[in-house]
Amino acid sequence: MCYLLTMVLLAGILIVPVFAASDADSASDKKWVIATDTVFKPFEYTDDDGNFVGIDVDVLDAIAKDQGFEYKLKSLGWDASIAACQAGQADGMIAGASITDERKDSGWLFSDGYYNATQSMTVQKDSDIKGFDDLKGKTVGVKTGTQGATYAESLKDEYGFNITYYEDSPTMYQAVLGGQVVACFEDTPIMASSIKDGDLALQ
């Protein structure tokens, strides 16, 4: 049975759903394969030495020590991590995401949260776009399956812009810098970290 240790953000809440294993699969009997998305700094990412680090990684390590199990972390990306869990190719997943009613209704369980997240939009530093009204007729970028995508979708019809979807954040930011899209949406802490650490010419 799959353990799902997914970190989830929404309206000031970051929480961890855990799907319990069957009695036959004691946590201490095996090394669990945990999938993740390591381009979501500061929650999960790789350092200069290629090690998996971040808030979610620290939480997973603490859970493993408390519950007495070993694990192997695999960076698969968000969609692939979910698919691996569903197919039994991974025992669980830990990654930054957002709480939605749809996820609750599908059976995700949530603990108390620890992070307050909001959504932000960024553009090139020399862009004439100052607000949502300036997006009319233009195209923005979002990462597939994120709250940033949901937020942009909620504004799309009102402000008359188009949306292009990307599988990871770095590609999305490069699309803004390269002019393929005029702006992008993402969780504020992820965006701030990406712009600062990558020294990106975005604002």
Description of each model-found segment:
Residues 44-48, 60-69, 148-167, 195-199:
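Ligand-binding cleft/hinge of the Venus flytrap
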Residues 24-97:
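Extracytoplasmic small-molecule ligand-binding "clamshell" domains
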Residues 36-40, 74-79, 88-101, 125, ...:
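Beta->alpha turn/N-cap motifs
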Residues 123-140:
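Flexible hinge/capping segments at coil-to-helix
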Residues 57-58, 73-84, 127, 163-180:
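Short helix-initiation/N-cap motifs at beta->coil->alpha
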